[in-house]
């Protein structure tokens, strides 16, 4: 007996359902991203209209000033002189052409990060990484995982971190998370608020030339009244510049929300910030890595050590000093 073929309407039922669903998902995602971008551009235009944010330079405007004594690429070529290398005894000149226009990092090379910490060690006073979130230039979440600290947790700091005991059930080890996170940060311009806290929790030092700490955003604003203090909180900056309320409620901070907000703040002053970076690179062409000695010294501080170990370390230091004298 030859089996009957399925009706034509039944055969094409699955494709007709799956394809529109996929298109609908992509269409909704595009609309959501477009609305977010429109809100961001509206805030930026409002700040520029109020004079809180300077307008970007128009095409064809005057180039950035050349530092005194610097030799431009044109002058060097016309003179026929070879530019000395840094450290060869002569004055080093830039490896880059004279900047006529500040170009920021490509969106694919710019990410924002935020970390949440819990308390370990004596009295829970040692901060260790418990959650890390990384978002892209456009606000897409690239990484968001809970992380199990290397030492037992004494204080979850839920009011601020939002971390609870239940979150640790699905947490990954710190060493695994560290490798995954540093792989995402490598070669990227990293944006964040008070980044030294995040990098210290990661036990990592990022190049200064690729770091954009949003605590310095007020420095790029033309309104002096916003220069209230040296370190303005992310919550205050979001409210003043983005008209956005964050870190509300009793469930603690969201590292995804904080990272996204930091990226929005950076994009408000991106043109001015990258112009300044271009000037500093032209003045000091060699991308010097940060001096990690000061960061390592923080890990060697004994202020959180048990009393017996701290007493022994201080006693040993005094004995060594006496022997040198």
Curated annotation (Swiss-Prot):
Keywords: Apoptosis, DNA damage, Exonuclease, Hydrolase, Nuclease, Nucleus. Residues 53-105, 281-325 are annotated as: Disordered. Residues 308-325 have a biased composition (Basic and acidic residues). A motif (Nuclear localization signal) lies at residues 165-188. GO terms for cellular component: nucleolus; nucleoplasm. A motif (Nucleolar localization signal) lies at residues 27-35. The keyword Protein biosynthesis does not apply. It is found in: Nucleus; Nucleus, Nucleolus. InterPro entries: Exonuclease_RNaseT/DNA_pol3, REXO1/3/4-like, RNaseH-like_sf, RNaseH_sf. Residues 56-66 have a biased composition (Pro residues). GO terms for molecular function: exonuclease activity; nucleic acid binding. Exonuclease with activity against single- and double-stranded DNA and RNA. Mediates p53-induced apoptosis. When induced by p53 following DNA damage, digests double-stranded DNA to form single-stranded DNA and amplifies DNA damage signals, leading to enhancement of apoptosis. This is Apoptosis-enhancing nuclease.
């Amino acid at each position: 007996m030859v089996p009957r073929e399925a009706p034509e309407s039944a055969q094409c039922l699955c494709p007709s359902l799956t394809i529109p669903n996929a298109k609908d998902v992509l269409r909704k995602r595009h609309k959501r991203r477009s609305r977010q971008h429109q809100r961001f551009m509206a805030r930026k235009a409002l700040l520029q209209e109020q004079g809180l944010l300077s307008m970007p330079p128009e095409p064809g405007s005057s180039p950035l000033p050349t530092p005194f004594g610097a030799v431009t690429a044109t002058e060097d070529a016309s003179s026929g002189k070879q530019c000395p290398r840094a450290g060869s005894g002569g004055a080093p000149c830039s490896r880059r052409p004279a900047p006529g226009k500040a170009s920021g990092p490509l969106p694919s090379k710019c990410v924002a990060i935020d970390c949440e910490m819990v308390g370990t060690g004596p009295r829970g006073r040692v901060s260790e990484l418990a959650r890390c979130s990384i978002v892209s230039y456009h606000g897409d979440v690239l990484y968001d995982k809970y992380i199990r600290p290397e030492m037992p947790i004494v204080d979850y700091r839920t009011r601020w971190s939002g971390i609870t005991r239940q979150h640790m059930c699905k947490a990954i080890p710190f060493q695994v998370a560290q490798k995954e996170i540093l792989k995402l940060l490598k070669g990227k311009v990293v944006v964040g608020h008070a980044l030294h806290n995040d990098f210290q929790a990661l036990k990592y030092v990022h190049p200064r030339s690729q770091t954009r700490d949003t605590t310095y955003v007020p420095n790029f604003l033309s309104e002096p009244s916003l220069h209230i203090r040296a370190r303005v909180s992310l919550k205050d900056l979001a409210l003043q510049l983005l008209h956005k309320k964050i870190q509300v409620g009793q469930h603690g901070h969201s590292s995804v929300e904080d990272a996204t907000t930091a990226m929005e703040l950076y994009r408000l002053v991106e043109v001015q910030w990258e112009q300044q970076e271009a000037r500093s690179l032209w003045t000091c062409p060699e991308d010097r890595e940060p001096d990690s000695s000061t960061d390592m010294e923080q890990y060697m501080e004994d202020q959180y050590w048990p009393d017996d170990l701290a007493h022994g370390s201080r006693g040993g230091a005094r004995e060594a000093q006496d022997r040198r004298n």
